Structures are given as structure tokens and as C-alpha cells.
From Swiss-Prot:
The keyword Signal does not apply. Keywords: Acetylation, ATP synthesis, CF(1), Hydrogen ion transport, Ion transport, Membrane, Mitochondrion, Mitochondrion inner membrane, Transport. The keyword RNA-binding does not apply. It is found in: Mitochondrion; Mitochondrion inner membrane. One of its GO terms (cellular component) is mitochondrion. This is ATP synthase F(1) complex subunit epsilon, mitochondrial. It comes from Mus musculus. Signal peptide: none annotated. Component of the ATP synthase complex composed at least of ATP5F1A/subunit alpha, ATP5F1B/subunit beta, ATP5MC1/subunit c (homooctomer), MT-ATP6/subunit a, MT-ATP8/subunit 8, ATP5ME/subunit e, ATP5MF/subunit f, ATP5MG/subunit g, ATP5MK/subunit k, ATP5MJ/subunit j, ATP5F1C/subunit gamma, ATP5F1D/subunit delta, ATP5F1E/subunit epsilon, ATP5PF/subunit F6, ATP5PB/subunit b, ATP5PD/subunit d, ATP5PO/subunit OSCP.
Amino acid sequence: MVAYWRQAGLSYIRFSQICAKAVRDALKTEFKANAEKTSGSSIKIVKVSKKE
């Protein structure tokens, strides 16, 4: 059985992004500001130096 998001041609990441946006849009205004703050993504880049 194929997942319905896969049948629609979506990756799981895109599907979860759509779901998260729908949840944030449905929030009451008092909770929406906090949800919008945390909705961004962040990455950390670490350069590894080779020590001999």
C-alpha cells in the first residue's frame, strides 16, 4: 500500500511542511506568534580539520 502523499507525488518532507503550515494557520492568534518564531529552520556547518 502506497501512502497517499506519495500517490500525490510529494516527498515526505514536503508533505510534513504542508501539514505544519496548515496547523500554524489554524492556531489562535495568541499562539500563532510563537509558532511563527519556531517555524524557521536552522543548520549548523562544522568544518573538520585533519590533524596528523
